[in-house]
Amino acid sequence: MALRLGAVAGLTTVLTGLPIADAAAATSSSFGTGGDGQVIHLLARLTSRTDLDLGAPGFDQGDEEVFTDDLFRGSVKVGYDGGVCTVLIVEPDGSSESQCTATFSLPGGQIAAQGLIRLPATGQAEFDIAITGGTGKYRKARGHISGTFLNATDSQIAIHVTH
């Protein structure tokens, strides 16, 4: 899931130390809906982004980012996502908080999610947002999506789905 608004206040230089190929390959479930829940581990790679400077000039409240990512399990593309984030707060130290909504298109259906994402001025940025619904295999989906921004284009995500 993208969230890089204006290079995200230095996130482009932050790496987890985990090789991207290893992060994407760390999967533990299929795309089926067996049992009461599953975790889908993916690598989200940015494919397009538009930053909209809607407030005062510069990075501030009201600015938006519209994005799409390709979703990978290992080296195989398994879907895509798209969404928009609106900046709510920019602190004097450069940290910020945005309201984000995104839809993940996967084999068998879509998963919708939203939540607040806090980006520190420096250091690792992580997020945890609510699954708000779905279609197809995911029509009764609930749960959350957690993730870590690895660099300016890649995020490691885990979709925790309950039915």
PLM feature spans:
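Beta-strand-enriched cores of mature, soluble protein domains
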Residues: 24-163
